[in-house]
Every structure is written in C-alpha cells, then in structure tokens.
A protein has these predicted regions:
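Short, conserved beta-turn/loop elements at beta-strand boundaries and strand-helix junctions
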Residues: 67-73, 120-124
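Residues located in well-ordered beta-strands
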Residues: 31, 61-63, 88, 100, ...
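Short, conserved secondary-structure segments in the cores of folded domains
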Residues: 54-55, 87, 105
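Intrinsic disorder/low-complexity segments
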Residues: 135-151
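A broadly conserved sequence feature marking short terminus-proximal activation segments
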Residues: 1-27, 133-134
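Cys/His-rich short segments
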Residues: 23-61
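Well-ordered alpha/beta subsegment
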Residues: 94, 99-136
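Short, basic/aromatic beta-hairpin or loop at an interaction surface
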Residues: 81-97
C-alpha cells in the first residue's frame, strides 16, 4: 500500500470522523440534530440553520447522479488507469458525493445506476470510499427509469 501514487485527501479536524469511518469501512455523514437532514461535510443545516450536527453511519447506497470518463491523465498517478471514471453519487440519505465507480466497465455506467459503497485501503492511513453497481441493479437490457418517473 505504500506505493500509492495518486493524490490523497487532506485530513483535518473537521473531516477526521469521515476518514476514520472510511478506515473502518463505514461511510459517515453529518445529520442535523433538529430536522434530520444529512450532509457530507457541512457546518450547519441548510434547511433549519441548526449548527448542531452529529456524525452517523450512512447506508452506503445511492445512485449515479452524473459521471465523466477521462481519456487523458491530468495527474501522472492516473496514466495506467486510462480511461478512468469519476462520478457524483446521490446517496440514499440525500447528499452528493464525488467518487469512482469500481467493478464496472465504463461503458455500463449510466445516470441513475444503483450503487453501493466499497472501500479501498490505499495507504496505512487512508481508505477511500468508492462505489460499485448494487447487487440489485437492472440488467443492461432493462432501461433505467426516466427522470420524473420516481425511484
């Protein structure tokens, strides 16, 4: 794990509970103690302006909100991964999270694809949450619901 060549997150006091959770293979979110809304890394609730947020374990499930396939390495650590993807995941709890889709050919990634979190221990200190297609995902022949048709 010591030869990881890609950029690593900056872990500070505000984000430490998130990264400690990832190390335990748990996806952590903040939740408003007043209204229950979930957030990724915020300082107060967007809905009720409550500043009392608590860290809670998330379900780890979500859907692909949007994604991009990179055919050029913008950092030398990614050159052997070309083409690689990045995705914005809409978590079941509501927040959006930028990550990667693993265990799925890039050609099969679609907006609305159900996903679940997996963890990659990249160094002795850092574990990255990534996502893979959920076990209950539709087959490639099953069209995904159109926008506005519900979940």
């Amino acid at each position: 794990m010591t030869d990881y060549q890609k950029p690593l997150p900056l872990i500070d006091e505000d984000s430490r509970p998130y990264w400690e959770g990832a190390k335990r293979h748990e996806l952590m979110l903040k939740r408003c103690t007043r209204c229950g809304r979930h957030f990724h890394l915020e300082y107060e609730c967007w809905d009720c302006a409550e500043s009392s947020l608590e860290w809670v374990r998330a379900s780890g499930r979500g859907t692909v909100y949007t994604f991009n396939i990179f055919h050029q390495a913008y950092h030398p650590g990614f050159k052997d991964d070309l083409p690689y993807n990045t995705a914005v995941i809409e978590l079941a709890e509501g927040p959006l999270l930028v990550s990667t889709i693993a265990g799925c050919p890039n050609e099969e990634i679609r907006i609305g694809l159900p996903v679940e979190v997996v963890f990659e221990d990249v160094t002795s200190e850092v574990t990255l949450p990534k996502f893979r297609p959920a076990a209950s995902r539709p087959s490639p022949l099953t069209p995904l619901p159109k926008v506005g048709e519900g979940k």
